[in-house]
Each structure stands twice: as C-alpha cells, then as structure tokens.
Amino acid sequence: MAYKNFKFDVDADGIALVTWDIPDRSMNVFDEISTQEIGEIIKQTTSDPAIKGVVITSAKEAFCAGADLSMLEGMNRSYAQLFKEKGEEAANQMLFEQSRQMSQSFRAIETSGKPWVAAINGLALGGGFEITLACHYRVAAENPKTRLGLPEIKVGLFPGAGGTQRVPRLVQPADAMQLLLKGEAVNLTRAKALNLIHAVVPAADLIKAAKDWIKGGGKAVAPWDEKGFKLPGGPVFSKMGMQMFPAGNAIYRRETYDNYPAARAIMSCVYEGLQLPIDAALRVESRYFTKVLRSKEAAAMIRSLFLSMQELNKGARRPAGVPPTKVKKLAVIGAGFMGASVGYVSAQAGIDVVLVDRDLESADKGKGHAKTVVDGLIAKGRMKQDAADAILARISATSDYNVISDCDLVIEAVFEDRKVKADTYAKAQPLLKPGAIFASNTSTLPINSLAEEFKDQGKFIGIHFFSPVEKMMLVEIILGKNTGDVALATALDYVRAIGKTPIVVNDSRGFFANRCVMRYISEGNEMLLEGVPPAMIENTAKMAGMPVGPLSLQDEVALDLGLKITKATEADLGPNAIDQAQKKLMVEMVEKQGRFGRKNGKGFYDYPEKGKGQKSLWPGLANLQPKQLDPDTLSVEELKQRFLVVQAVEAARTVEDRVITDVREADVGSILGFGFAPFTGGALSYIDFMGTKNFVALCHSFEKKYGSRFTPPKLLEEMAAKGETFYGRFPPKKQAA
C-alpha cells in the first residue's frame, strides 16, 4: 500500500521500515494526513503475519516537530459549528473522539503484538516525541543538536497523546513534572539518563541498531503492560507520592498563579492517571485535553504564540517584490552593552561584525562582552570551544569609521542623545557603500526626527532590540515616513537571520512596546503613591500574569535612565506630557536617595552582595508614600485588572494611531517584548476574548476612579458599539515572503 507522507519497505527479515517524509515541508508534523496514515500503517503491520516488527524513522533532518496546531484550530471550528447545530453534548463528544485519535493510534502500537522501534534521527517534539514513547524501544542517532521534549504547555496545551501518562511511568516524578510543566526539551545525554531513550548510536548505524534489537528478540510489550510493573516514584498514595504532589501543587501555583488551565490539567492528569491502568489513564488524559482545547487561553495562545509568530517569522510583513537580501557584514557603532550584545548575536548567526566606538579601548571592551558570553556557555557545557572561537573570530573592534565602507547594514547604538546621534550620522553617511542600509537602535527618540539628520531617508530605519539581547526574542522595526521597501526588507531579513521575531511599527514616541510597558510601570508608581503596600503591588502584578512586578522592572532598567527619559519627554513635549507626581518620586529616589536600581545595589529593592541572600523591598518606600492603605480594604482582582487594562488600552491606541497596522504584531510583540500575560494571547487578544463591550465598560469604570489614562480611544468605543473584535475588524494577511 502506498502512502503520501510515509515510505514503507519490508526487508528479507520481515522488518518494516516506515520512513516519515512529508512532501514540500522542511519538517514532519502530525497533520491530518499523517495522523490518518500512521493509523493505517499500524493496522497493516499488525494484521500482516509476514511483518515481524516495525522501525519508524524520518527522511528529514528532524524526526518530527509535533502536531500541526492549525489542525487543532480546525477541530475547534468544527466544534463551534456542531455546537450551534446539535448542542454542547454532541460537540464535546465529537471533539473528544477527534482529539484522541493520535492517543488511540499510539496505544495500538503498544498493544500490536509486534515490536516497534523509534529510530530517532533528530529533533522530536510534542506528538513526535509521544509516538516514540509508545514504541517498545527508542534509539537515537548521535547528534549534539537533537532535542526531545513536550513543549505544548508553551502554547496553552499539554501533551494529549499519552505524554502525561507515559513520561511519569518512565521517569522519576519530580523530573517528569519538570518535563511536562516547563516544556523544555532535553539533549540525548539527559534523555538517556532520564530513561526516555534506551540507546544512542552513530548516525550511520541507526537503522541497523533498530533492526538488530527486533532481530535479537525485543519484547513487544510496554513496561506498564507487564505484570508487576511499579511506578518509578512509587504509588501516588505512598510516602514519596505524598511528598511530591502537595509540593508540586504549591510550586505550580507559585509559578503560574493558576492562570494556565493546561498546567492545572497536567497536575490532574498525572495525579489521577497514575492511580489507574494505562487505558483508563489515557481516557482521563483525553478528557482533560478536550476541556483545555476548548479554553479561551488555549485558543489565544495557539493563535499568537504559534500561528501568528510562525507567520511573522516567515516574513508576513516583508514587502512584495523586493529580492531576498543577505547581510554578510554588519557594523555596530557604539560598543556599549547594547551594541556589544547586538554584535554578539549577529556573529553567532554567522555574520561578520565590526564594533566601532570613540576609542579602541571602548570597542575592545564591546568585543570582550562576546568573550564573556561564550566563556559562560562553555562553562555550562552549552557551547564547544571551536564554536566559541568561530564567533569571536567574526567580531573585530576599532575606532576607525572607515571600516563601515564595505558593510551591508550599519546599526547605530550610541547614547540616547540627539546630538550624539547626529554627530554619528554625520561621520558615517559619507562612508556608506551604495545600497547600504543604516539603522538606529533608539528605544525612545522618534525615528522621523532622527531621520532629519540623514540625507537618504529611504535607507534609514529603526531596529530596536530589547535587553538582554541574547535572551529577548523580539525586535521592533520602526518605519520612518520616508523609509523605503528595500530598507524594510533588509531589516526583516537580518532579524530573521539572527533568529529573532520581528514586528513592524510606524514611528511614535516609545514606538509600540515601550508605550505599553511605560503604562505598566506608571501604574505601579500610581499605586505606590495611592498608598498600596509595595509588596501588594508586586504580587498582584505577577498574579495578573506579568513576569516581574513594576517596581522590580524599574530597578532592572535603572531608575536614573527612567528619570532621564521622563525629563527628555518633558523637554520635548512640555510639562503636561508627564506625571509630575511620578517625576517627583523618581527625583527623590535617584537624586536625593541615590537609588539607581540593581546596578548600584539599591532602588525600590535593596540588593545584597552576590551569594548573601535575596533582594528585599526597601523599607524607606513607606516614607515616600503620602498615605498607606490597609491591604484588607483593597481588591486584589481590581489591582490585577488595572495592570492589564492600562497596557491593553494603550495597545488599542497604537492601533488607532496606526503605529500598529497588523494586530498579530501587537499580540506577539506584547508577549515577547514585555511579557504581557501570555495566557491572554497578548494585549489585543485580551480585549477580544473579554469582549470589546465588556472591556470598554471596565475602562470607563476605572476612568471614573483613576483618571483619563483608562479612557478608551474612539476606535474601541466604535468597535464596542458594533460588537467587533480586533481580529474581525483587522483580519491579518496570511501570505509570507
């Protein structure tokens, strides 16, 4: 029988080799065809007495990247349609049956009576890893890049094809929960130590090793189907179980604040499933998976963190008609922390980099940052010396501007001062080669005003990185009014080449991300001045889904920098453009108290010397509050909502102002750029899933109590009146360049 996505061969020993190779895709995924065909292959191999065993592998570099989440979106659409036609019970049953097809197929592998071997030749994630767990033997090809894992939690789901039941039956409970709840992939050494795979062999011997295991009498029985099987950590109701599950629940609550239905479902699946035989446990898993799949959190996270991000990473915003560009050599002018970091990630991606600064000592210091980073990675076993040497060899440092004359892209990363930037542009412009693109990494100064110092404004663009550059995945590309398509295409191609996710925004003070995050910071300061206890401010922000509290965030950014930005905004736009009470607070903190944040060991928090305890809120904050409110009189829910609403309403303003022209970018940008509660799907999805009518009503409620910062823009009022959503009114274009 011929298959579309699999090659099927049987050798003289009766061993079937099933090779996964989806046409016209760089990676295998479980789409509808693959799911259907693997079911047919299982039936064929089980029923054919001539077949003695099965080896499943991949013809691609990776084994399988997991389920095609757009297939799950289709299931949800079918659910919604059936719900309308036949009601909730029929729709739930349909979703349950559809969502457990993979789980049933994988169980059929285990119980087929024929030995199955997973010959893992590369990356295996999600459903791609779950099918290997259902095989009776797992052998992997030696490859330091191979990772195995179950990352579904990162898009609001959990492993629904047996992962929550097989992993804790193979692995010690604490390790199993880490794999499931964090969604982090492990290398082969770690996977073997955890008992997730049985063997690692040279790539050339992979298929032979798999077949040899079958020919050597490999048993076609899963461990949990054998009589006398014992869980690695003992029964749930045992001393170890009682130590693990209560502590696990506490850790889960601490990390998620119960905002993620999938995380709660994982805890329940494992706890309930380990008390049952495997078949009943798999049904429990499928029930929970069906429930989570219907949740707004899963729908929002799948849309933003998988579908939208994938589309943006593939170049959804790239202008049509511009040939592909490649930055072979990059100049970074300004080798401070930000510039040095940009240089490092570029060199890591294979781009030759020259760091330019006012003197050689400063430029060399920038290159030294790259050495510090690679030395740290080597010490942690995450980079080989030869790879580190290659990165460092691609970075040169100089004080001579003439070196930029053969660069394809020049990024300015000097101090946030108009005069300093203007001087830099004056030096650089005469040296640029024809066709070179010039970008500013400014984080606050409008691109249009900076472009006035540039003769060919068509080749001038903003490329705003977020700190720390090595970790932050978002890059804002800012268009000036005269920025050309080639400049935009070059910027997008470069950002994609260094493995970051780009969003394209129009010029505005603070662009998109800083406009929204400054609202978050300001709301924290407002609460402080209202008399809300500082600890309550920080904790309710994290309960709302933010990664760090607003006071802690200011310490990380640096309070003196925040004050400089405030003063610059006031100088440019006048005294009404800033909150004078907040300025007074920051003047007190920085100029009178000398508290700059983490960098000098004291800000809103006190920071002990390394290794001498944890940071703690500065007791002196109480003296800066005009009054102090009793926490028992405050609504935790209202404080949480204030943090999210004030950011979301600003995101809506950026759409009205045409700073954001693609709603996907607001959602992806808000999550990757400043950690806006990921379970909401992003700032605009937060509004959409709440309903624009409800959101506007909440805005007006807060507006009456707290002021005009909560006033919804006219666009939102209009959308609420019509019952529109952002994704309905501004449907994204799906094409990618």
Model regions and ranges:
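Conserved catalytic cysteine-centered active-site region
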Residues: S105-A118
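Gly/Ser-rich catalytic serine loop of serine hydrolases
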Residues: A118-G128
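N-terminal glycine-rich phosphate-binding loop for ADP-containing cofactors
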Residues: K4-F6, D11-D13, D21, L72-Q81, ...
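Conserved CoA-thioester-binding segment of acyl-CoA-metabolizing enzymes
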Residues: M1-T57
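Amphipathic alpha-helical interaction surfaces in cytosolic regulatory modules
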Residues: I33, S47, K60-R77, F106
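Structural motif
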Residues: I15-T19, E37, V55-T57, V117-A119, ...
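Short, active-site-adjacent cap segments at secondary-structure transitions
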Residues: E61-A65, L125-G126, I404, L445-P446
